Amino acid sequence: MTSSIECKNFLRSLQLLNLLIKIGVQNLIVCPGSRSAPLAIAAGELNKLGLVNIFNSIDERSAGFHSLGISAASGNLSLVITTSGTAVSNLLPAAVEADRSCKGIIFLTADRPLRLKDCGANQTVNQEDFLSSVCRRVLSTNLNGLHETQENEILNLVQITEKQISTFPGPIHLNIPIDKPLGISFLNKKNVLEVFERIYLKKKYVFQEVEIKSNKNKFLEILENLNLDESGIILVGPYQGSINELSSFNKSLEKLQAITGWPVFADPVSCVYSDLRGLVVNWELVLRKNKNLINCHQLLRLGPMSSSIDLEDFLTTFEGIQILIKEKNYRKLDPIKKSFEYDFGLLNFITLLLAELSINKINTKSLTPLAIDLMEEGEQIKKILKEKITNDNQITEYKLANLVPKLWPAENPIMLSASSPIRDWLTFSENGTLTRNCFSFRGASGIDGTLSLALGISRIKNPLLLVTGDLAFVHDLNGWLIENSIDLNLTILLINNNGGNIFNRLYKDNLKEDELKKLFLMPKEINWKKLAEGYQVNFKSVTNFKKLREAFEWSISIRESVIIKVDIDPENEISDKNALLEKIIGS
């Protein structure tokens, strides 16, 4: 085999990607570019061998979010390959969300070699710094070029990556300087592939298992402040663990509830199973109505706080103890700063708890009087909602939050975009998301990448329903440019209120109509049917819930991407919802 730079670039790219596949990468998004050619060509060859799935995206920003959606839905590492320069900067929004939502994703970026740095060379920037503030690690191969990198250096880089992801999941930036020539001849490629397949492909590598050691003293400190024989509440926020660990999380939660008999408030994206004993339906409305009457002095909080002002007010004024258990998230996670934080997850906490209490067999404790009262209150509110929200009603956002979980098949996954949908579903969905996987990216809680995230999820979990407002949707239309995106089984429920309706709720009373529109709502007169046709996406517009049910059945049956638009009158939405809330709070 020739020892030319092009051959070494290609071989090292094969070795690097092969090792990343061995630590869990199954899906790879490749973006266009010349500097990343050795990595892209190597990825293509590994795809031919059936080792990794590859999808392409011309927009790095969409690619980052698409990869993040795949990671969230699969529980496995995902990977994005980009060229150098501004391409790397476009990964930042997805890196921010991956950081805050603790999802494993690798950004593999090609760079210029050291000799071209800081001298005005074309398309050469300090890209190694672009993602450093949000990535768990920023690592590099030999700065003089990939061709000068040794095999053991690549192995070491991947071992560091695997250890970091296992310990504290999040984004990793691997910045790879590559010198010319970037392409490779057919003959040289054939020769390198023969060497790789003969020597490296089936080579065994040892990756040490990472043992997550808990802090027993911290646990004992927390236990001293808990009295499991007295009343309390379990609050489950957005789930930040791996989807592969959902079963153990829910089994641990079931044990915790059995030991305590406490009621459970579950966020729509908590991933709590719907058959958990003690679940309080309509808990946010129960809290809004009764927050001054809830008599307990201890709270067990799992994960970050839900997007509920009522809950935040309750926690801020709560005078008892608050314990916050996090899933491999080692940063502070309590904005009200009133909790004992435990970093090592619910499974670890329950394991230590059972050992400390010498419990071999759990005897299920009766529901506490507080649990019974809160559950009954939730059921009373449910009766009011059933009476006031029917399939005959005019479509509004809050009615969608209540009825869509009943119209969309109970086992099919849902993704909620940020802004209005997640808040409406928290208030009105009646635990309807708990029968299925429900996703919403609550790390940074932005509307960035909504479509690309949903398309990524739908590669793994489908048929998927995305519930999104119009601004969140158009913010990421480049998602349709991801390879075969229109062929994915994704149904988009497009809530068209001609602007950011959440700002209507926040600022309508304090601004003139023209100011509100220009500064916050930013309405766009879009012909949605023509927009869908431009991307060759199936489209329907519906005006009532009966037609919406039929549209859902149609979208699932055709197994392709579909946009179902519903128009919302913001004025009617606000007055209608306020009247309902007044009836509930006054009941």
Curated annotation (Swiss-Prot):
SUPFAM superfamilies: Thiamin diphosphate-binding fold (THDP-binding). Its EC number is 2.2.1.9. Binds 1 thiamine pyrophosphate per subunit. Pathway: Quinol/quinone metabolism; 1,4-dihydroxy-2-naphthoate biosynthesis; 1,4-dihydroxy-2-naphthoate from chorismate: step 2/7; Cofactor biosynthesis; phylloquinone biosynthesis. GO terms for biological process: menaquinone biosynthetic process; phylloquinone biosynthetic process. It is an enzyme of class 2 (transferase). This is 2-succinyl-5-enolpyruvyl-6-hydroxy-3-cyclohexene-1-carboxylate synthase. It comes from Prochlorococcus marinus (strain MIT 9312). The lineage of its organism: Bacteria, Bacillati, Cyanobacteriota, Cyanophyceae, Synechococcales. The gene is menD.
